[in-house]
Every structure is written in structure tokens, then in C-alpha cells.
Amino acid sequence: MMPRGNAMLVGVGGSGRQSLARLASHIAGIGVFVIEITKLYRLIEWRDDMKRLFEITGVSNTPTAFLFNDTQLKEQAFLEDINNILSSGEIPSLYGKDELPAIYDGVRKRAADAESGGTAEELWAFFIESIRSNLHVILAMSQPLCPY
């Protein structure tokens, strides 16, 4: 429930990490965003999903938990992007220059209400701050059983 609050759940397979994350999100009144991995899921689909997640949390200003499972880690770039989200709130080069005006228009009213300013840099900073406040990353990682 805390702004910028994230979680990492580690346990053996079937221990209820994802169920616990969904229950905690429901209790906190936070929606859960889960990506659906298919055989053809690659970096392009990942980036599209991250754009949707950023629009939910940054433009729509909706608190959302991003539940990511270790079995969904198909490419190393996924982990790098999650690291960037956790450290700075953004993924470098996620948006093209042609996509930025729609984001600026989406946050302009809220930024004006918050007296944040109306330049492109100020609107982008407001967008990133909204993402950082509303996005809660939950990593659910498996730990193999120890034979000892």
C-alpha cells in the first residue's frame, strides 16, 4: 500500500506466492497486472505490455501491482527493464518521439492541478512520478528444494 512499495516473494513451487500477492493486492484495493507469456512472446510484446502498464499507472493514475513470475523470464532484457523500473521508474527508449504527445496530453490536467508546470520535461517528470507512486512490482521467485 505504500507509495513506491515493492515485494519479492521467494518459496518452493506451489507455496502460494502468487496467491498471496493477489490476496494482498485485493485487500489493499490495488489491481493486479500480469503478462501472459506465449511461445511467441518476445521483447516487442514485453515492451507493448510495459507501455500498457505505464499508461494504467502513469496516465490513468491507477494503483497497480505488477506480478512477475520467474517462469515468465524469457529474455535477459525483461530483468534489466524491471531493474530500471525499480531504480528510476522508467524504461529507457520505451517510447518513440511520436508517442510522447499522447502521454503529455494524458497527464496535462493532473499536472496542472498539482501545479507541476506544462513543459514537455515537466510533464514527463510528472508521468514518471505517477508511475513510481502507483506501480508496485511483485517478483515471485522459486527456490529449489534443498535436499539437506
Q: What role is predicted for each listed range?
A:
Residues M1-Y148:
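Conformational switch/transducer regions in large eukaryotic molecular machines and scaffolds
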